Amino acid sequence: MTQMTVQVVTPDGIKYDHHAKCISVTTPDGEMGILPNHINLIAPLQVHEMKIRRGGEDEKVDWIAINGGIIEIKDNVVTIVADSAERDRDIDVSRAERAKLRAEREIAQAETTHNIDEVRRAKVALRRALNRINVSKK
């Protein structure tokens, strides 16, 4: 069966490099499933989970918290260039919980002072923290 090579790259280096038979990511237009021999494509990614179903007898599924970036699909090679990315097994849940609480406090404070830019920034931080928490539970 044809498989794809999947790489997730961040400014800190390669976070993931495996073969897969199916990938699921979220773009601004919604969830996108990717199978081998997919058309060539470049698309932006949302802060969301990435599901990678590997081939083989065990049908292993890997989960990665993707915090924005782009996906490029070309000739059965899928490359994700992300601002940051963490595999489910690598997520520090207590740190993510603290980031969630901090973002919630910042949202409340920014809304009180009507600081729109600060509200937006804190909401992005909250989405990232919630994404990491959700992926850690997979």
Swiss-Prot record:
It comes from the Bacteria. GO terms for molecular function: ATP binding; proton-transporting ATP synthase activity, rotational mechanism. It is found in: Cell membrane. It is a peripheral membrane protein. SUPFAM superfamilies: Epsilon subunit of F1F0-ATP synthase N-terminal domain (SSF51344). Keywords: ATP synthesis, Cell membrane, CF(1), Hydrogen ion transport, Ion transport, Membrane, Transport. Pfam families: ATP-synt_DE (PF00401), ATP-synt_DE_N (PF02823). One of its GO terms (cellular component) is proton-transporting ATP synthase complex. F-type ATPases have 2 components, CF(1) - the catalytic core - and CF(0) - the membrane proton channel. CF(1) has five subunits: alpha(3), beta(3), gamma(1), delta(1), epsilon(1). CF(0) has three main subunits: a, b and c. Produces ATP from ADP in the presence of a proton gradient across the membrane. Belongs to the ATPase epsilon chain family. This is ATP synthase epsilon chain.
